[in-house]
Amino acid sequence: MANEVYANNMEISCKAANGKSIAAFPDVCFTPPQAPPTPLGVPIPYPNTGLSKDTTKGTRTIRITRKEVMLKNKSYYKTSYGDEPGRAPKKGIVTSKIKGKVYFTSWSMNVKFESKNVVRHLDLTTHNHASFPGNTPVWPYLDQATVDAGGGPCSNEVKKEKKDCADFKPHGSKDACAGLGAGKPSGKKTSNEADRLADKVAARKCLTARRCALQPYKPNSCCPQQTAHHLIEASALHDKGRGGKGSVPLKGISNYSENKAPCVCAEGVNQNVGTHGLMHTFQSAAAAKSRSGTLQLSNGSSISAKKTTYGTAKRQSMAAMGKVFPQSKCSKECLSAQLDNYHKQCGINARTPIKAVETGQTDVTAATQAIKTRNARLGATRSRVR
């Protein structure tokens, strides 16, 4: 049952909770038989599950329902379940373990117990650790909340993904990314590789449904051939750069990480090609209408730049998604909830001033025609975000 203790409107993870990190995939482990041509065993991906009841090294003095609470970079689930058949001597392909620990890779930015950040419902995990890194990619942490009950702003998208991806991992045994190509497409403007990849993805119901599930920049669950695109540009939140060395965040913004910020899985390795390029085109065209002004920085200084607000940039990014990915039909309620879930932790709200970023191509007419041509090829009906 839920323990009704929240941080940033998300339930805090504790040993007393019924929380799970479900079906993290793939946890690749060597599995018998061990014989030529696979003397180490057959490498097989397994779905993993971690349970809150296995919380270890939590809080010492603060309790929820009389039990310890998960903390940043200290606590973990002592066991993950699902990879037990991978019992060849080598075991996990990365960690040489099975049933390894589960660690969290995100947490509340501003709520702390015992001077450490608390972990919450829907924070991200990696599974089957001997020590960091784990064998599996991150997977959302689930607890007693609306997603568990099949409700919430993404309820329709969750149901659609389960239906359209029933045959694909983690629900089934097939790989949704199979057949998309050997690697990422060329980033040259003269190449149409990214467009061909976009056609393949748009024709697959599972991948178009999964487009609505925003991903961190890295690690993420996009197909290897795809590229994660920030819906709110990382550079919009800093004086220069994307938050690395030498970047100063705008006033009021803290603990932002470009690697953890929400992205859509797009096609194209840069801002000039494929659906990645189309997203930049529409978002940049909207940003170009912004007026120049002064933006205050967190260090007390200021810069002059075209400025907008987070709320406006969010609406523009969702509108761009509706144009570029009409097959996905992601609702604005679902996208908005996911974007807000992260950015509010960084001190950002709808009125927060940010930079209006213009990158990539600028020909909206050509971009619109490219989408119409693709839709005609796919027999799709063009639609915007609802």
From Swiss-Prot:
Swiss-Prot/TrEMBL catalytic activity: Endonucleolytic cleavage to 5'-phosphodinucleotide and 5'-phosphooligonucleotide end-products
Enzyme class name: hydrolase
Known EC number: 3.1.21.1
Any one biological process term the GO annotation gives: protein secretion by the type VI secretion system
Superkingdom, taxonomy of origin: Bacteria
Keyword tags: Hydrolase, Virulence
GO terms of molecular function: deoxyribonuclease I activity
UniProt key word Disulfide bond: no
Matches recorded under InterPro entries: Tox-GHH2_domain, Tox_PAAR-like
Assembly, per entry: Interacts with Tsi7.
Function: Type VI secretion exported toxin that via to its DNase activity induces growth arrest and ultimately DNA degradation within target cell. The activity is initially neutralized by a cognate immunity protein Tsi7.
Designated name of the protein: DNase toxin Tse7
Organism: Pseudomonas aeruginosa (strain ATCC 15692 / DSM 22644 / CIP 104116 / JCM 14847 / LMG 12228 / 1C / PRS 101 / PAO1)
